[in-house]
Design a protein with these regions (language model features):
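Domain-level signal for soluble alpha/beta catalytic cores
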Residues: 1-132
C-alpha cells in the first residue's frame, strides 16, 4: 500500500501541510503505524522537486518506509483561462540529486510535467547511480 499525500506550502513559505492540516511528520508516523509499504507525496501548492526533497527528508527522519516523490512542475499561472506550468524540465531535474540524497527511492512527477520532464528526471537519476 502506498500512502501518498498532497501538501501545500504555507503563506510564509516555512512549512508544508495537507489541506486538512496534516504535517509530513504526522503523515510519516501514521503511515508506518497503519502498515503502509511506501510513504509518498504528490502535487500541492508550492510542491516542486525542491519542496519534495525537503518533505522526503522529513519522511526519512520520522519513519523507516521507502519514500516516493511525485511533485509538480512548479506553480501554474493562468493564461487565457488555462493553467500553464512554466518550470522547464532542466529546472525540475536540477533538484533530483537533493531528493535522492534526502532519501527518495522512487521519483516521478505530477501536474504540469511532460515527457521531457520525465526524461530529464531519469537522466539525473541515472547520473546519480553512476556516481554511486
Amino acid at each position: 500500500m502506498i500512502a501518498s499525500l498532497a501538501y501545500d506550502l504555507s503563506q510564509d513559505g516555512t512549512f508544508y501541510k495537507t489541506m486538512m492540516g496534516i504535517s509530513p511528520e504526522q503523515a510519516a508516523e501514521f503511515a508506518e503505524e497503519c502498515g503502509a509499504n511506501i510513504i509518498a507525496l504528490n502535487c500541492g501548492t508550492g510542491m516542486d522537486m525542491k519542496g519534495a526533497a525537503l518533505v522526503a527528508r522529513i519522511y526519512r527522519d520520522h519513519c523507516g518506509l521507502p519514500v516516493m516523490v511525485q511533485p509538480n512542475a512548479g506553480l501554474p499561472v493562468l493564461e487565457n483561462l488555462k493553467a500553464v506550468y512554466k518550470q522547464l524540465p532542466a529546472d525540475t531535474a536540477r533538484e533530483v540529486p537533493a531528493a535522492l540524497e534526502a532519501g527518495a527511492a522512487i521519483i516521478g512527477s505530477c501536474c504540469g510535467s511532460t515527457p521531457e520532464h520525465t526524461r530529464e528526471i531519469r537522466r539525473m537519476v541515472d547520473q546519480a547511480a553512476r556516481r554511486n
